[in-house]
From Swiss-Prot:
It is an enzyme of class 3 (hydrolase). GO terms for cellular component: extracellular region. Glycans are attached at N246. PbH1 repeats lie at residues 162-192, 193-214, 244-265, 273-295, 307-328. Involved in maceration and soft-rotting of plant tissue. Hydrolyzes the 1,4-alpha glycosidic bonds of de-esterified pectate in the smooth region of the plant cell wall. It comes from Aspergillus clavatus (strain ATCC 1007 / CBS 513.65 / DSM 816 / NCTC 3887 / NRRL 1 / QM 1276 / 107). This is Probable endopolygalacturonase I. The lineage of its organism: Eukaryota, Fungi, Dikarya, Ascomycota, Pezizomycotina. It catalyses: (1,4-alpha-D-galacturonosyl)n+m + H2O = (1,4-alpha-D-galacturonosyl)n + (1,4-alpha-D-galacturonosyl)m. Its main location: secreted.
Length: 368
């Protein structure tokens, strides 16, 4: 009987010894090796478990997304060579990221080429072909996207919905669209975000260099923007989130664009724009407005009738200098009655163009 007990205990001991340690399995999973993928399907399905992912000359099939929204937290994603996309009329996105502690970058000489001319028809998102949005940086937290070279997006380039996201030294070159029907090629569209920092961007496009529709604690600095619609807040209003606050846009240049500095809010909507600073912005060859602030947008166009539901308060305009084209307006302000207040306005020095005779409800201290 005694020998049976001993044998039983020995057998039990061997089973316990053979059982894997949960902590060791967990740690080994976290330390998975680098992975290189040559197809979008591989990358989208097999990225989990890789601490570093290299995307080597990926050709994304038509109508599919290079989906990197399920990578492990802390993953580094590296673009290598040319990333390209098949043609199909659909809404996209062509690429998407999500996660915590994610780093996205590229190796020297890499390019992410949307080949947007296949979709461009001069209508953008307002009709014609259905065009895919390019990149979703959604549900990213404590992450970095750096050094990407992006070319010829079909429409909007990078859509941001994130918390504490750094976007540094990104080039978005849609200049081919100037003569080939590029439209609505916004570079950075930001919504429902807290802590977005865009530094050193170089943008050539046919729409906003940056458009902040909602969010707080947002910074754009050291940027160079040309060909588009300028540095924009809005349109604000008519969405689930209609609050913009604590935004700094500074130390940047805007050239050969429709507008320089722009804030626009939606007619008869509600929301707020507060504590926004534009400082040290250099303008050159601005075609329509050097500075334009209006509370009258409806269906994508100004109505000429401002409303008061989205007040603009705590605005600082400081050091906006340079030139506008001969037919352009230096400054245009169209506010509702009492809905623009507590503004600081200094160092505005624009040449060329003309002054507006249609400004309304200009707040104390501002000049139109």
């Amino acid at each position: 009987m005694r020998s049976v007990e001993i044998l039983g205990l020995a057998a039990l001991g061997s089973l316990v010894a053979a059982a894997p340690s949960p902590s060791r399995v967990s740690n080994s999973a976290k330390k998975a090796s680098s992975c290189t993928f040559t197809s979008a399907a591989q990358a989208s399905k097999s990225a989990s478990g890789c601490s570093e992912i290299t995307l080597d000359n990926i050709a994304v099939p038509a109508g599919e997304t290079l989906d990197l929204s399920h990578v492990d937290d802390g993953t580094t994603i590296i673009f290598e060579g040319t990333t390209s996309f098949g043609y199909k009329e659909w809404k996209g996105p062509l690429i998407q990221f999500a996660g915590t502690g994610i780093t996205v970058k590229q190796n020297t000489g890499a390019v992410i080429d949307g080949d947007g001319s296949r979709w461009w028809d001069g209508k953008g998102t307002n009709g014609g072909k259905t065009k895919p949005k390019f990149m979703y940086a959604h549900k990213l937290r404590d992450s970095t996207i750096t050094g990407l070279s992006i070319k010829n997006t079909p429409v909007q380039a990078i859509s941001v919905q994130a918390t504490n996201l750094q976007l540094t030294d990104i080039t978005i070159d849609n200049s081919d669209g100037d003569e080939n029907g590029g439209h609505n090629t916004d570079a950075f569209d930001i919504g429902e975000s807290n802590g977005v920092y865009i530094r050193g961007a170089v943008v050539k496009n046919q729409d906003d260099c940056i458009a902040i529709n909602s969010g707080e604690n947002i910074e754009f600095s050291g940027g160079s923007c040309s060909g588009g619609h300028g540095l924009s807040i809005g349109s604000v209003g008519g969405r689930d989130n209609n609050i913009v606050k604590n935004v700094t846009i500074t130390d940047s240049t805007i050239s050969d664009s429709d507008n320089g500095v722009r804030i626009k809010t939606i007619y008869d909507a509600t929301g707020s724009v507060g504590d926004v600073t534009y400082s040290n912005i250099k303008l050159s060859n601005i075609a329509k407005y050097g500075i334009v602030i209006e509370q009258d947008y409806e269906n994508g166009s100004p109505t000429g009738t401002p409303t008061t539901g989205v007040p603009i308060t705590g605005l600082t305009i400081d050091g906006i200098t340079g030139s506008v084209a001969s037919n352009a307006v230096q400054v245009y302000i169209l506010c509702g009655d009492g809905s623009c207040s507590d503004w600081t306005w200094k160092g505005v020095d624009l040449t060329g163009g003309k002054k507006s005779s249609k400004c309304e409800n200009v707040p104390s201290g501002a000049s139109c």
